[in-house]
């Protein structure tokens, strides 16, 4: 079993408390019948990844950030849109990053720089590292993220919103 722990300091998190039933024996529970595990909400992961992409801007070559953002929006009902809206605003405020840079805006020259990085990133992924087929084009990933943001949140400026 592979366990990965990511430690973060200084960020705000509203954890979720999940009850978990423990394994029991024929004589009953080994210890307690249920424990409570605090979990990091997916909306906070999304908000922190999005803030990192915005903050790093054209200095961001971390394809994992784009992969994670795409995966979270691609999974049906993974994110609660209204909660995501609140959490993104909270994380951006806490990290002193403006939401005015949403949706993601990259010029074609930067997309041309990202594309080979994205291609190599996708090639190096094992099948266990992705549960969703990833687009071949980084532009498609960015467009999907932007589309989700404009359709599901109030984070984009009114001129960026798509008509309903």
Descriptions of predicted regions:
Residues 1-164:
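Structured mid-to-C-terminal alpha-helical surface segments
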